């Protein structure tokens, strides 16, 4: 099956004008994807949807970091709630201790 990916191709042409090899990461460049990568518009559960509207199964799931899939409602809600206390804190926080304690309980 061959899909028309003209929008991804156009987005890549735009990207190469402002980013080295058209991406912010070496893994997104043509060395890994051939002529141009697919540009993903959105994701839900185990599915990715490209800029041209095609649906794909996300076999990689962020290299294993998404066991519940993309845009899981409970995860999205937790992220929204957590964002009200700060979006990126490089300082020490209580939640950091709580996560470490949880990991310690789960992995003796």
Outline where the language-model segments fall.
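Glycine-rich loop-to-alpha-helix module at the N-terminal edge of alpha/beta enzyme cores
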Residues: 55-108
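Short active-site-proximal "capping" loops at secondary-structure junctions
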Residues: 32, 45, 64-66
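N-terminal alpha-helical segment of soluble enzymes
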Residues: 1-2, 82
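Active-site-adjacent loop/helix segments that line or gate small-molecule/cofactor pockets in enzymes
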Residues: 2-42, 102
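Active-site and channel-lining beta-strand-loop segments
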Residues: 38-58
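Short, flexible segments with low predicted structural confidence
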Residues: 19-20, 50-51, 74-75
